[in-house]
């Protein structure tokens, strides 16, 4: 480790393989906490490179529990979090809309870090039991079209750095990893980011991974398509700034997106969207995010307008709600 630290202090970059070796060494307790703290601090001060991020990703996946799913093409929809907007569970709701439209979804998530209710909170609130049993996971994917992968069951490396991250109290490379360590390694992903720097970083990451992707950012700082103003979308096929009106949506008010003050209130909004009784702004935001997810799955062969209509039909027909009920039945 000492050699790596000296190189970082000299503003050198570490290779993908070196970073993977370091991560595996951390899980084997090869380094004292002081050296790990120094490593994380050096990386944060200089800025993490794509290869350094991918090296830690490789190490987390290698030391974790894999989830080998029996499907060729499925998507994960996730936001980076940390935008401090306390929105309702937009990405998670969009996942069930996408699955209701007949596509496969492998949602990877965790408990809330900066909001009232994260993906795991709202899923668990409905009585779901998290599992890493691959047979149960594949049954859920095949019969409900969607599977939920609770991060803490799979990324075993994270427990080795938990106390250090808590003590540092500033973001580290680990804050950038949660969105690219889905143990099922989906070939499609829709990622919401809170700023354009993150968009550039993950655009390079996904290009190196060779997957189909969409990255979205609302210009006013939401890590998803909020419809509160202009938003930018970057995919394998195009890069464009949209206005809500371009897609036939009214501009949303920030207060219409708030996820409530309690986990119960967040779950009620989640339910109301799937039951097609949500505020128009809440439904529209889910339709927009689900629509861009569907476009990723379709490799950009369908227009975004077509994909949003597919998502709308999933809600209006009750298919999204039926999908969620089947998911609950299989996973409770």
Report each predicted region and the residues it spans.
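Short amphipathic alpha-helical face segments that pack within enzyme cores
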Residues: 38, 93-97, 285, 289-292
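Long, low-complexity, intrinsically disordered polar/charged segments
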Residues: 71-77, 95, 99, 183-188
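Short loop or secondary-structure boundary microenvironments that flank
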Residues: 43, 109, 192-195
């Amino acid at each position: 480790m000492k050699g790596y630290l000296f190189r970082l202090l000299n503003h050198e970059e570490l290779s993908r393989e070196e970073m993977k070796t370091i991560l595996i060494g951390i899980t084997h307790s090869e380094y004292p906490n002081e050296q790990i703290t120094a490593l994380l601090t050096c990386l944060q001060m200089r800025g993490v490179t794509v290869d350094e991020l991918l090296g830690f990703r490789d190490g987390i996946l290698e030391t974790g529990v894999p989830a080998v799913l029996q499907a060729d093409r499925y998507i994960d929809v996730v936001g980076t979090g940390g935008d401090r907007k306390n929105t309702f569970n937009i990405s998670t709701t969009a996942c069930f809309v996408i699955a209701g439209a007949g596509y496969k979804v492998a949602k990877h998530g965790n408990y809330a870090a900066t909001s009232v209710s994260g993906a795991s909170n709202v899923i668990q609130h409905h009585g779901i039991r998290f599992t890493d049993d691959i047979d149960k996971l594949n049954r859920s994917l095949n019969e409900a079209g969607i599977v939920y992968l609770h991060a803490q069951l799979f990324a075993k490396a994270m427990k080795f750095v938990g106390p250090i991250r808590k003590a540092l109290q500033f973001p580290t490379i680990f804050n950038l990893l949660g969105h690219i360590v889905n143990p099922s390694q989906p070939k499609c992903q829709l990622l919401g980011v809170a700023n354009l720097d993150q968009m550039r970083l993950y655009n390079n990451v996904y290009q190196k991974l060779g997957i189909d992707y969409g990255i979205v950012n609302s210009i006013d700082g939401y890590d998803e398509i909020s419809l509160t103003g202009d938003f930018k979308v970057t995919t394998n096929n195009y890069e464009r700034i949209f206005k809500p009106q371009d897609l036939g949506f009214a501009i949303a008010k920030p207060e219409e997106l708030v996820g409530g003050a309690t986990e119960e209130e967040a779950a009620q909004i989640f339910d109301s969207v799937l039951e097609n009784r949500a505020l128009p702004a809440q439904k529209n935001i889910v339709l927009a995010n689900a629509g861009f997810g569907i476009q990723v799955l379709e490799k950009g062969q369908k227009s975004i307008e077509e994909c949003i209509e597919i998502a709308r039909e999933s809600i209006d027909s009750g298919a999204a709600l039926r999908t969620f009920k089947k998911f609950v039945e299989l996973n409770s």
